[in-house]
Structure formats: C-alpha cells, structure tokens
Curated annotation (Swiss-Prot):
Signal peptide as annotated in the record: 1-24
Tissue: Mainly expressed in flowers.
Superkingdom as given in the UniProt entry: Eukaryota
Similarity section: Belongs to the FPP/GGPP synthase family.
Name of the protein described by the UniProt record: Heterodimeric geranylgeranyl pyrophosphate synthase large subunit 2
Alphabetical keyword list: Carotenoid biosynthesis, Endoplasmic reticulum, Isoprene biosynthesis, Magnesium, Metal-binding, Signal, Transferase
GO cellular component terms given for this protein: endoplasmic reticulum
Ribosomal protein among keywords: no
EC number: 2.5.1.-, 2.5.1.1, 2.5.1.29, 2.5.1.10
Assembly: Monomer. Part of a heterodimeric geranyl(geranyl)diphosphate synthase. Interacts with GGR.
Chief location: endoplasmic reticulum
Cofactor binding note of this UniProt entry: Binds 2 Mg(2+) ions per subunit.
Originating organism: Arabidopsis thaliana (Mouse-ear cress)
Alphabetized PANTHER family for the sequence: FARNESYL DIPHOSPHATE SYNTHASE (PTHR43281), HETERODIMERIC GERANYLGERANYL PYROPHOSPHATE SYNTHASE LARGE SUBUNIT 2 (PTHR43281:SF18)
Length: 376
C-alpha cells in the first residue's frame, strides 16, 4: 500500500474515532449495545471456565507457592540468576518519560500542547509502554526499536483517560493525583488534546526502524485495539450497563467490558513489542495470550482497589464505580472471589510464558506480580 494512501486511511479513521468517542452517550450506545451483547461469548474465559471457577476454590500447586516466595519483594530468582524488578521498572519508566517528553510538541497551539503534556507527563505507572519494551526484548529485540510504539500506546492510553474523565462519560475530577485535564483546561481543549494524542500516536509509531511489512502489521494491531473491536466497544458496553440489575447480567458480560476497555491495550502493547522485536507467529501468539491475562488481571485488581482504598491512596476518585452503578467484579462475585480470581489469572499468565527462557521472561513474570500486588 502506498504511504500516502495509508496516511489518508489513518487520518479518516482518527477523525471518525475522535467523533465517536465524544458523541458516544447516550444515543449511539443504545444502537451499539445489541451487536456488542452478541459478541460477549468471544471474551477471554468461556462460560464453562467461569462457572468452574465460581464453583471451586483456587488451589495453588506447590510450584506456584514456591514461585510466589521467590518473587517476594520484587525479586525473581532461581539457581542461575537474580532479577530485581524495582530498578528495572524505574529505569524503563525513566526511558519512557524521556521519550514522551521529546515526542510531545511545545509550540503553537500552546493550549493544546500544554494540555497534552499535562495529561501524559503526569506521574503514571507506565505499565503499558514497559510491557511493550519487555515483550520486544523477550523475543530478541532492542529497547530503542520498540520505544516509538511504547510511546504510541501510552499516548492512546492517555487519550482514553482524558475521554473517560469527561462529564459525558465517567465525569471524574481526579486522575494520577491531579485534577483531570478538562477541569484544568476545559472540555473543549481536553477533547482536542485527546484527538491530537491519538493522531500523534500513529505518526510517532511510524518512526520505528522496522520493515514495512511489520510496520503495517503493527499499525493494524494498534488501530484495531482502539475501535469497535477494542476500547470503543468496552466503553460503549460499560456506559450502557450502568445501573443494570445484577440478575440481568452475567460474568461474561462484565468480562467483555474489561477485555475490551482495559485488557485490549495491554495486550496490544505486548503484541506490538513482539512484532517489532522480530518475534515468530508462535512467540507473538504466546505473548498475546499472556498479555490478555494480565490485562484482565489489571482490571480485577482495579475493581478491588476501587472498593478498598481511599482517593488519597489511589490518586483518583475512589468508590466512583459503585456510585455510578457500574458493574465490577466485587459487585458481581464478591470481594473474596475477586481476590481468588486474581490468583487464577496470575497463574494462567505465567503458564503462557513457559516456552521462553527463565532469564528473558523474568521481567514479564515480575510485572505480572507487580500488577497483581499493586496498591494504587
């Protein structure tokens, strides 16, 4: 495909997606919901697996228990090496922050660029870009090759947060310990800055020095994760599910929301890293399955924290899901079962990495533990 045609398609996609995000509620959601509900069964866990989980307690095997002990304190070790996760996380986050600082423009239009920088340079965990970098290195790639994609994923994640926080969506005033973008710059500037981040993400990712075939593959993966097979689908179902009676929905309904709204971008981050790193089809599929597990894991933990932590501890408004009548795992299956689900997803995620060497996989194993044990 000619670069000019590819750019035109991307531009049209970005403009239509930005319009969809900002005009989603409530009319389009009502039109969108039936088709979404018909696709709930494509979510991560099957109905039988969910039922089996709810009917039986989690039983960790001896190997799982031993591994938990080995990872205690952010350290993964075996007889051959020791991996310390905290220094790794800090180093990767610093590299990502530096790259983001350089990637976001500073000139005119000043207000838009200020809002973009305000939103994206706030103190975030950078889990998604770090996942991208770690997945690239897992299959033999280099950090610098995956950095443009890592930044692109963080730009899109930040765009989604800006949109989520708007009064027409989740109506939140606090994000990453600071007032949300629309509270500081107004709704108009917030919407425009989100659209600009979305556009910049694709532009920036194309600076990666990889083959044209892998670039098209990566662009397709990223675009798919944002639209009606990704973020938009999850957000649409989430909004349309507010206030539903628990008897009207099942666990697969909730899972559809979170697989598409939260897990999809974590999955995409990992897949992009593996694509750019030169991974084989088999390696990329293993990474995809792993990341899908930790993406859902991230959301289950988020639901637990929303119910058990304060706004000061979280850096965002606590208890907002309950107030808005949103579906959450604790609400649907209870707090204890939700915690057991965390253990199950953690174990499943690790199993998808068994084909890789212990040393190369250590950052992703430790990242899984970090996500499962995070407190904000």
């Amino acid at each position: 495909m000619e670069p000019q045609i590819l750019f035109l398609y991307l531009s049209l996609f970005i403009l239509s997606l930005n319009f969809f995000f900002t005009n989603l509620k409530p009319r389009l959601v009502r039109l969108f919901q039936p088709s979404l509900e018909s696709r709930v069964k494509t979510a991560l866990l099957s109905r039988k697996e969910v039922a089996a989980f709810l009917d039986s307690p989690i039983v960790e095997d001896e190997e799982g228990e031993e591994r938990e002990e080995e990872e205690e304190g952010g350290i993964v070790s075996n007889a051959n090496f020791t991996f310390e996760f905290d220094p790794y996380m800090m180093s990767k986050a610093e590299s990502v922050n530096k790259a983001l600082e350089e990637a976001i423009p500073v000139g005119e239009p000043l207000k838009i660029h200020e809002a973009m920088r305000y939103a994206i340079l706030a103190a975030g965990k950078r889990v998604r870009p770090i996942l991208c970098l770690a997945s690239c290195e897992l299959v033999g790639g280099q950090e610098n090759a995956a950095m443009p994609a890592a930044c692109a994923v963080e730009m899109i994640h930040t765009m989604s947060l800006i949109k989520d926080d708007l009064p027409c969506m989740d109506n939140d005033d606090l994000r990453r310990g600071k007032p949300t973008t629309h509270k500081v710059y107004g709704e108009g500037v917030a919407i425009l800055s989100g659209g600009a981040l979305l556009s910049l993400a694709f532009e920036h990712m194309t600076t990666a020095e990889i083959s044209s075939e892998r670039m098209v593959w990566a662009v397709r993966e990223l675009a798919r994760s944002i639209g009606t097979r990704g973020l938009v689908a999850g957000q649409a179902m989430d909004i349309s599910s507010e206030g539903l009676d628990l008897n009207e929905v099942g666990l697969e309904h909730l899972e559809f929301i979170h697989v598409h709204k939260t897990a999809v971008l974590l999955e995409t981050a990992a897949v992009l890293g593996a694509i750019i790193g030169g991974g084989s089809d088999e390696e990329i599929e293993s990474v995809r399955k792993f990341a899908r597990c930790i993406g859902l894991l991230f959301q289950v933990v988020d639901d637990i924290l929303d119910e058990t932590k304060s706004s000061e501890e979280l850096g965002k408004t606590a208890g907002k899901d309950q107030l808005a009548g949103k579906l959450t795992y604790p609400k649907l299956i209870g707090l204890e079962k939700s915690k057991e689900f965390v253990k199950r997803l953690t174990k499943d995620a690790r199993q998808h990495l068994q084909g890789f060497s212990s040393e190369k996989v250590a950052p992703l194993v430790a990242l899984t533990t970090f996500i499962a044990n995070r407190n904000k």
